[in-house]
């Protein structure tokens, strides 16, 4: 059997896909999740495997976390638990800090104490994007705009990991994600526009486009399919990079154009209403992926057209458990 991985936030959208891959590749996987946003249905099929365990624990609870480190003695920590909402971080920065900074520090301290080998951290390429112009891409050493407490907490987390990796001697990889989408992404909370738009289309409801006056097609984003994100995580598990890397496609698209692709795939002409921008939103976020490609050869394989087609096919599955995915499907 491969090494032991403590996968924190492993019942969530991205984490559950990583959990499946790790189990398949014969790692000993311990998913830690408080299920505040993660769903047990995302991982329950993994219970049939001997190399899988689930523990319901809040990362802010140091004592309970330490019991897990003592019990399982993980060699690798993969951290995907977070308060992910930009608007919520503005409304309640103390809560954002308690999860994204205090919770992370609990994991870091225990990682040092129990002498883990490597630490993978899911950061945000979108929230930490530099101030880029049309046609430009944000690189890892750009000065982040830090337009929300969420962005600040993620950036702070990156700095803590780099510092304590040197103090404690573990390797690390910081993955700055573009806008990730794919199966199991929930429509409530900070889920991104694709599942929100898709759910509205399937329910026959109009969608809303938040746009700046000088950007009538909405903000510019970089969308990455979840299977490509899983591959990046597997690289970090097998060979930590000891740096921060962008995980995106490097291809920009407006939010309105994303909606038009959904209209085409789902064969609908439902309207979209325009309103003003949301507080804390970055106007343009497109990630340069040259660094990660040069370091380890990672490149995305799924473009936005194929990714949305895959989503459509996924949600047409007659065996889909709607309760697990928290989305109303009418196909």
Question: Where in the sequence are the language-model features?
Answer:
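Hydrophobic alpha-helix immediately C-terminal to the catalytic Tyr-X-X-X-Lys motif of short-chain
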Residues: 156, 160, 164, 193, ...
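Active-site phosphate/pyrophosphate- and oxyanion-stabilizing loops and adjacent acidic/basic residues
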Residues: 44, 66, 162, 195, ...
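The catalytic Tyr-centered alpha-helix of NAD(P)H-dependent dehydrogenases
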Residues: 142, 146-153, 177, 186, ...
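C-terminal substrate-binding subdomain of Rossmann-fold SDR/epimerase-dehydratase oxidoreductases
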Residues: 202-331
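N-terminal Rossmann-like NAD(P)+-binding domain of SDR-like oxidoreductases, especially those catalyzing
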Residues: 1-180, 298, 302, 309-310, ...
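Short, charged helix-to-loop "capping" segments that act as catalytic/coupling loops
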Residues: 70-74, 129-136, 187-191, 205-226
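Residue-level recognition of oxygen-bearing side chains
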Residues: 64, 85, 95, 102, ...
